[in-house]
Amino acid sequence: MIGENRPHIRPLEAFPAVAQGGQPVVIFRDPLGIFRETLLLNPQTAHLVALMDGSRTIEDLRMGFFRAFGVLPGMGELDQLVADLESKGLLFGQTFDILAGEKV
């Protein structure tokens, strides 16, 4: 995932919420219904996902997160997040194209 990979999140609905235990979360829902579940992320990870507009490399995303929160996420963590979003069809790319084709 290192290099010129520029993750591009699809338009999703996002809602702030409070999880059991009182922790703030952001709930993401796919309005196209390709990913039928909801995705719960902590606000910091949700911020990182919001930066995935297709214009930023993985390293750009890491630096954007660092500027916002003062912590540099590990490459492995970020690669895993991107892989997870991709596998769910939440990023524009090959998996989304396949899943969208199956839905038609």
Regions inferred by a protein language model and the residue ranges of each:
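Long, low-complexity, charged/polar intrinsically disordered regions in eukaryotic proteins
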Residues: 1-34
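Long, charge-rich, low-complexity alpha-helical segments
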Residues: 32-104
